[in-house]
Swiss-Prot record:
Location(s), subcellular: Secreted
Tissues expressing this chain: Expressed by the venom duct.
This protein's name: Conorfamide-Tx1
Assigned GO CC terms: extracellular region
Role description: This peptide does not show activity on human and mouse sensory neuron-specific G-protein coupled receptors MRGPRX1.
Keywords: Amidation, Cleavage on pair of basic residues, Neurotoxin, Secreted, Signal, Toxin
Superkingdom of origin organism: Eukaryota
Signal peptide range: 1-19
Family (UniProt): Belongs to the FARP (FMRFamide related peptide) family.
In-chain residues carrying the UniProt-annotated modification Tyrosine amide: Y46
Miscellaneous comment as given in the Swiss-Prot or TrEMBL entry: Negative results: the mature peptide does not contain cysteine residue.
GO molecular function, one term: toxin activity
Amino acid sequence: MSGRGFLLLALLLLVTVEATKVEKNKPGVLDIPVKSNSDDDSIFRYGRRDMQSPLLSERLRF
């Protein structure tokens, strides 16, 4: 692997770990609660769905 590719991978991992820390500390800015039109007060969350992806959690395990 070239030096540039290694640096990009390290930077991506660092950003991912920092984003995960922020996600645990407080809800994300993109998590907007929206009430549905039905009578029950179900809330849909938009944004940051990639944080719960199985591929990302597998990458963070090593």
